[in-house]
């Protein structure tokens, strides 16, 4: 990713519009802000009127003559017949299994799995193969298991050289083959759009041991916590324990101290990032070795950030900086003069759709019916071509929302505004 950034323009103040997976993806794939669509929680977007009546990026590109392909984790609510090829299904695993269902890994605190579920409570090397004894909750099971109901099979692991591939490895391999396939089957130079969604560092943080070995526990630097960091939040006085605070408490209790627990979790998180970084490298290598490198726009970003102990939290879906801020890198061919430059202006993920539309000169209505909404974002192309730009057509701030759960009215949700200097949380 550092290599890509050195060839690209890096947005240092880019933010998710809703910092949790499903609604974030519904938002950036349509360009419609959550406050406009009403999608800021965990419901199925395919049952939401605005979403199903607004065109997504692949739908709009397909109408404009593009072949559209995806693999891995791109949509949570994937509309039918959108892609020409859907590639590898998103599977978060492998996970421990008791013969009936996924459970927490025995090397991690049992109470975390009980309270948070097996995904968020699993962070071990792939070589730590679970062996679950029989109990009243299941007949027992030895080995890993894929987590997706569509996959629903044993994950084979004998050694690092003799095992099944993780979903992200399969997606990287799929991309390498897809580029070759396009070269062999492309008709009349038909343009293409490929969305490759890597799952890590989403939990479970299970990757090959070699990535863990790069980050020895005795060299891990954990989050430096501010004194009295919760004073400004009113959590203790007014709110029930959040999931993020619960995860932090259970991690600390499970390992006997905040420092030990956070070191172990941070090691797993860094290992997963390093693993994902290598998968990104495989995709870029395949593209750069092809004849398409010089006329393909590359956009790399994440759906949200993550708190690692800040504000006594270990999760996403809140309005603090570390959770809303995301990596955003755009590589434009023949833009060498701006390679490695950064943009400090606040932008957000709803700007992805208009940016792609601008670069690809897409035309036509972005609505399926009058019940849909047009993209709320703005093209980032002016920043890519002039990173020092001080003004643009878009807003001067990035707007993020988190559900209040007490009302469906947009004005009743929790909001954060990020400017070039400040963050205001309501």
Map each language-model feature to its residues.
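Formylglycine-dependent sulfatase
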Residues: 1-426
């Amino acid at each position: 990713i550092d290599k890509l950034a050195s060839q690209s323009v890096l947005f240092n103040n880019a933010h998710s519009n809703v910092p949790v997976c499903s609604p974030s993806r519904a938002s950036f794939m349509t360009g419609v802000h959550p406050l406009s669509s009403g999608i800021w929680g965990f419901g199925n977007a395919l049952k939401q009127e605005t979403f199903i009546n607004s065109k997504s990026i692949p739908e709009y590109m397909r109408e404009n003559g593009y072949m559209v392909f995806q693999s891995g984790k791109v949509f949570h609510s994937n509309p039918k017949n959108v892609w020409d090829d859907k590639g590898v299904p998103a599977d978060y695993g492998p996970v421990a299994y008791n013969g009936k269902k996924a459970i927490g890994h025995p090397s991690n605190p049992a109470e975390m799995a009980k309270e948070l579920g097996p995904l968020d409570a699993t962070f071990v090397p792939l070589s730590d193969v679970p062996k679950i004894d029989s109990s009243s909750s299941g007949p027992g099971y030895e080995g890993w298991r894929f987590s997706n109901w569509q996959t629903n099979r044993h994950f084979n692991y004998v050694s690092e050289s003799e095992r099944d591939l993780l979903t992200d490895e399969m997606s990287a391999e799929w991309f390498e083959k897809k580029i070759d396939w396009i070269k062999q089957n492309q008709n009349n130079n038909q343009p293409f759009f490929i969305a490759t969604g890597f799952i890590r560092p989403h939990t479970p943080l299970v990757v090959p041991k070699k990535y863990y070995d790069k980050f020895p526990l005795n060299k891990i630097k954990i989050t430096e916590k501010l004194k009295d960091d919760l004073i400004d939040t009113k959590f203790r006085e007014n709110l029930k324990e959040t999931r993020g605070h619960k995860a932090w408490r259970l991690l600390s209790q499970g390992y006997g101290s905040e420092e030990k627990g956070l070191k172990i979790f941070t090691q797993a998180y860094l290992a997963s990032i390093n693993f994902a970084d290598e998968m990104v490298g495989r995709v870029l290598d395949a593209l750069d070795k092809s004849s398409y490198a010089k006329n393909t726009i590359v956009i790399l970003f994440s759906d949200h950030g993550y708190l690692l102990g800040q504000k006594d939290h270990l999760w996403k879906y809140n309005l603090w900086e570390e959770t809303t801020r995301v990596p955003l890198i755009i590589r434009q061919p023949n833009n060498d003069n701006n390679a490695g430059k950064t943009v400090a202006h606040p932008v957000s993920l709803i700007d992805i759709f208009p940016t792609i539309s601008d670069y690809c000169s897409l035309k036509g209505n972005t609505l399926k019916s009058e019940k849909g909404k047009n993209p709320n974002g703005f093209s980032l192309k002016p920043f890519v071509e002039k990173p020092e730009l001080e003004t643009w057509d878009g807003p001067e701030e990035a707007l993020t929302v988190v559900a209040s759960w007490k009302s469906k009215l947009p004005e009743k949700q929790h909001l954060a505004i990020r400017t070039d200097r400040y963050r205001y949380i309501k």
